Regions:
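ATP-dependent phospho-/nucleotidyl transfer catalytic cores
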Residues: 1-54, 63-65, 70, 128, ...
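Hydrophobic HxD+1 residue recognition
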Residues: 57
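Active-site activation/catalytic loop segments of kinase-like enzymes and analogous catalytic loops
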Residues: 11-21, 82-117, 131-148, 160-167
């Protein structure tokens, strides 16, 4: 899993969502601005791409098996950034939860891994990957609604926006992206 793959996936936001909701004459500007921000954010990732990443790690792909949790739907798994799956689980658009609950899961993960990770570096990557992943999801859900006529996915897009807002509001690294999103959306 590399930055080129992450860029390509995040670009689905532009390819489907922006294309549907932004007028043609404004689209070129937003495409340039957001692509620049995606590249900037990807350049700020600090963890190595060196662990198993499920990539679709959310509540719907977890099942209880005896007294353990099993993961299903692993066909998209790759080697990637260690913060990606936690971002997928905590900021899952299919499962609304409070910030307090999200923080509890996040802090529990940090506690379990305190000797293995630098908390500042991990938080940086977690927030970047959450934002990029939710932009990708907005694009995918728009594609499912437009191309495949699966309109049910549209109802999840507002929560994906809330998750993006949650992650970008207090982190200066997102200042330019926030301005762009606020202006156009």
């Amino acid at each position: 899993y590399n930055n080129a793959k992450l860029f390509s996936e995040t670009k689905l936001f532009l390819d489907w969502y922006a294309k549907k909701y932004i007028s043609r004459n404004k689209r070129l500007n937003i495409n340039i601005a957001i692509k620049k921000q995606i590249k900037f954010l990807l350049s700020k990732l600090k963890l190595k791409n060196n662990i198993f990443v499920h990539r679709d790690f959310h509540v719907s792909n977890l099942i209880k098996c005896k007294k353990q949790i099993a993961v299903i739907d692993t066909q998209d798994a790759l080697i990637g950034n260690g913060a990606y799956d936690l971002a997928s689980l905590i900021d899952d658009v299919r499962f609304k939860s409070t910030k307090k609950f999200k923080d509890r899961i996040y802090n529990y993960y940090l506690e379990l891994n305190k000797r293995k990770i630098n908390e500042d570096i991990f938080k940086n990557d977690f927030e970047i990957l959450s934002v990029l992943r939710n932009m990708k999801i907005i694009g995918i859900f728009t594609r499912l609604a437009v191309r495949d006529k699966k309109k049910i996915y549209l109802k999840l897009i507002p929560y994906a926006w809330k998750l993006i807002e949650l992650r970008i509001k207090d982190n200066k690294i997102f200042d330019n992206l926030k301005k762009i999103l606020d202006f156009y959306f």
